[in-house]
């Protein structure tokens, strides 16, 4: 989200956005002309249950209650900046590009992490998180022939490996101490 703030501060407005998973959601919010500061406030409203039971599927509204009202009446064609998001057809095992029609079902599809959120039925398919196949859809962005692509990978690698030799060290790390 900091990248959006820097782009806004520098007066840089992309002519096209592509995203997958949470990047698709952030892209949709930004493409609908919501300022970066407001997107950050919306993101602070995201709620992941403290006690998540693996295999128990959550609802979109449980996790993203602040985003739903902002996107539910939009279509891709209404956006100020063209947007494409990727999802994966669960049965065919292929990447699907979504860039027309109602926005919210497409965003639910690109964010539908298997085992956390249910697959999104869309166009006769059952779609899940695009990150299952393509974490950083740079190829998707280039397919629209832009002059420049700015890619942001929010799944960072650790800067250093920490060896936890003692049981106490492992517990302290788990507790954030």
Describe each PLM feature range.
Residues 1-20, 28-177:
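Patatin-like phospholipase
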């Amino acid at each position: 989200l900091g990248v959006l703030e820097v782009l806004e501060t520098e007066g840089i407005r992309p002519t096209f956005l592509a995203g997958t998973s949470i990047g698709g959601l952030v892209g949709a919010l930004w493409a609908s002309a919501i300022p970066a500061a407001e997107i950050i406030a919306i993101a602070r409203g995201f709620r992941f249950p403290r006690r998540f039971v693996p295999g128990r599927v959550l609802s979109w509204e449980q996790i993203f209650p602040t985003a739903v009202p902002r996107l539910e009446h939009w279509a891709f064609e209404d956006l100020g900046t063209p947007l494409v998001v990727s999802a994966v057809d669960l049965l065919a095992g292929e990447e699907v590009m979504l860039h027309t029609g109602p926005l919210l079902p497409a965003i639910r599809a690109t964010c539908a992490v298997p085992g956390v959120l249910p697959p999104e039925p869309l166009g006769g398919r059952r779609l899940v998180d695009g990150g299952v196949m393509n974490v950083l859809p740079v190829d998707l962005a280039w397919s629209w022939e832009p002059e420049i692509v700015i890619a942001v990978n929010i799944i960072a690698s650790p800067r250093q490996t920490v060896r936890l030799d003692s049981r106490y060290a492992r517990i302290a790390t788990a507790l954030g101490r």
